[in-house]
Structure formats: structure tokens, C-alpha cells
Amino acid sequence: WVAATAARSSRVMREESLGPVVGIMPVKDDAEAIALMNDSGFGLTASLWTHDTARAEAIADQIETGTVFMNRADYLDPALCWTGCKDTGRGGGLSVIGFHNLTRPKSYHLKKA
């Protein structure tokens, strides 16, 4: 489902969707796009579509999200941590970090008496 005419204040534009839903809206420049992306309580994934890798990296550095895709949103590299921020949650899945999050590592602080 593509929401191309949804208001900026609507749920589809402000809340996390874990289904086949995308909200699209025009912006005047990258600064406005970044401000709108960051104006949310969620931050799981962003997908940037551009031919300019340097521009994508510059935007990715400024958006508050745990995972950033460029020209895709269909793949998770098992070697990289998949993580979110804000109300999306903390911690991560996949990678060594995800393994440790799921297996509950334990710290030992031992001192000989």
C-alpha cells in the first residue's frame, strides 16, 4: 500500500509500519527530509534512493535510525547488526552482537580472597 497523499501528521507518516506500507511525500531539500525522518518516536530502518553514495552517507549520518539501506530495503547482511533506536528498541539482531543479545552473556567479576 502506497500512501502518496497522506498528511504529515497521519499515522502512516509518523509510526512504524512492519508490513507492505510506505508513505511518500515531497520535500524541498535534504534538510527538510532529514527533519521529517527524525520527527518520529521510531527509528528502525531508513531506505535512501539515490545515485550519489556520498549524499546517502551524509544523510545516513544525520538520521536517527539503527539501519540504513541505499537503493534497497530487501536484504539483511547476517554479518551486520540489525538494530533500531528510539521507541523501536535497543539492542540488535543478527551478527555477533545479535547472537550475544539472544544468548544472554554473563559477566563474571571475581576477586580472590
Residue ranges with predicted function:
Residues W1-A113:
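Conserved C-terminal structural/oligomerization subdomain of aldehyde/semialdehyde dehydrogenase
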